[in-house]
């Protein structure tokens, strides 16, 4: 069962929450505004999937910045694919938007590097990939590492775009 005793060892990527077959992990916001996983011991099966999938030991401290051009985005969408990128929610929190129509791209925030509400995004990405659709996922390196861990590595049809990051700001700011 996952227990966060040192917050510097958790990036809040939600991979553990998404991997848990018992669905006993929820993300809770701390006083500083960061989300961390908390497991319900009454529901936990002690299968270890949450700790196995954690990408933190593999995250390298580097900045690798790419951009997805409008033309590339349009091509993915025209081919029936979807794009996931940070987007401002109406309640002024940052979540992930799923875009499958060219007219929806305007709401994406390509340069937003704050801790975002990912919640079911990893499950949705997996569903679309299993359905044979192309998926573009843009995010900070730890979210990309978490998604790759959740999916079991690189996947055909998945394009990952990292935004530069030197540590995300709290969404509570």
Enumerate the language-model features and the residues they cover.
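Short, conserved beta-strand segments within well-ordered enzyme catalytic domains
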Residues: 26, 38, 53, 84-86, ...
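PAS-associated C-terminal
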Residues: 4-5, 39
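Iron-sulfur-associated redox domains of electron-transfer enzymes in respiratory
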Residues: 61-173
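Short linker/helix segments within small regulatory modules
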Residues: 31-44
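Iron-sulfur cluster-binding cysteine motifs and their immediate structural context
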Residues: 2-4, 15-33, 49-67
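Short, surface-exposed ligand-recognition loops at beta-strand->loop->(often short) alpha-helix junctions
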Residues: 6-11
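Electropositive phosphate-/nucleotide-binding environments in soluble metabolic enzymes
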Residues: 41, 48, 115, 119
